[in-house]
Curated annotation (Swiss-Prot):
[4Fe-4S] cluster binds at residues 90, 96, 99, 178. The gene is rlmD. Pfam families: TRAM, tRNA_U5-meth_tr. Keywords: 4Fe-4S, Iron, Iron-sulfur, Metal-binding, Methyltransferase, rRNA processing, S-adenosyl-L-methionine, Transferase. This is 23S rRNA (uracil(1939)-C(5))-methyltransferase RlmD. The keyword Iron-sulfur applies. The lineage of its organism: Bacteria, Pseudomonadati, Pseudomonadota, Gammaproteobacteria, Moraxellales. Catalyzes the formation of 5-methyl-uridine at position 1939 (m5U1939) in 23S rRNA. It catalyses: uridine(1939) in 23S rRNA + S-adenosyl-L-methionine = 5-methyluridine(1939) in 23S rRNA + S-adenosyl-L-homocysteine + H(+). The active site is at 415 (nucleophile). Belongs to the class I-like SAM-binding methyltransferase superfamily. RNA M5U methyltransferase family. RlmD subfamily. NCBIfam families: PRK13168.1, rumA.
Amino acid sequence: MKQQAKSRKPQQPEYIFQVETLSHEGRGIAHYGSHPDHPADKHGKKVFIRYALPGETVKAQITHEAKRLEEAEMVALLAEPSANRVEAVCPHYGICGGCSMQHIHPDEQIRLKQNVLQSHLQHFAGIQPEQWLEPIRSLQSDYRRRARIGVRYLPKQDRLILGFREHHSNRLTSIHTCSVLDKKLSDSLPELRNLLQSLKGKVHIGHVELAKGDHETSLLVRHIEKLNNADVNQLRQFALHKGWQLYLQPKGPESLRRIDEEQGAMRLHYALNAFDVNFAFSPLDFTQVNATVNEQMVQLACELLQLQQGERVLDLFCGLGNFSLPLARCVGAKGVIVGVEASEEMVQRATDNVKRNNLVQASFFSQDLTKDFSHHSWANQGFDALLIDPPRAGAYEIIQYVPNFGAKRIVYVSCNPATLARDAGVLVQHGYQLKKAAVMDMFTHTEHVESIALFEKIQEIND
């Protein structure tokens, strides 16, 4: 891993360690005392070593010291590598902070993520699912269909950096390729960097965002000062050449404007073909970055809910309708889908998507789900099933209210195993049982753990 050597700090000590196991985020764990050169006063102290794997003997440089543990970075592998070690595919791996597990075999990444979920469920809720489902895997390595890429101009060097932040740093590292970014987007990075370098107002550009629909691509340029007409025209010509939509954003989200309006409305699109639904979205809208995992996830959610024609489903944190529209197909014209989302703009987007797909059985409401919502009409209806897809903070406030919905089945989609486990414990207290769970490799080569879980209401037995 040649990239790592560039970040070594000679003043920091280096030691030899025997790596014992992996932490939840994929770092090797070792202890002082396993080698004669270890300081005696550190005997037994735990060390977390980036890039090291269990069973390996490594030389590592200490990067951070605390009272009970230390952090380090592997600088040399001294013996046979672990069977789970693979060669990182990205030339920027080790400096760029985007990926953290490219050195770990994909199967081991999945196993580690499932262990993380199992551990959190046991620790926070004291439960395990009755059945572990097969993990949902990414079907391609270049899975990311959107990315925010930092821009920084260095006047003294007359050099523009286009790239991602370094690990645990605000410093940008320049990249010319990204192995997890959609290949067409990745291949465009050098050309995009050269374009930005040529602009007079490059010092005013903070970042760019690339987003890809099924058939369209957008380039969004975030700038803090107005760009002159010549710069805007250069950007426009680049977008025309690439066949991309071009957007400028000088301030907040409300300032977003499309420059090449003659090419169409401010929209990208993606489809979930298994459900015959199509979504329109803006470059700033939240969409899942991994298209293949998203489609598998939506299919599994619908299968787990076992929806029947005419049933009523509540979709909480519904966004632009990624689950709502497929659920509407499952319950048919006589069913009811109610979607709730904090963002009024996303509620409007979901409503528009329902109309474009002729799904009259779905309706949407704007509501901050961390606040009291019990007085709203939608909250006082009965539902056969719930789908909950919260942010990392989880859905603790909503979970308290769940018994009032009367749902027999709940599918919880999570991007944080700790908050899923916490909320699962509350659901169990409310009389639900964790039936099935699976991890989803939405963010391959990173420590992020996405998961999906099915809870079913325990039937009460009358005496």
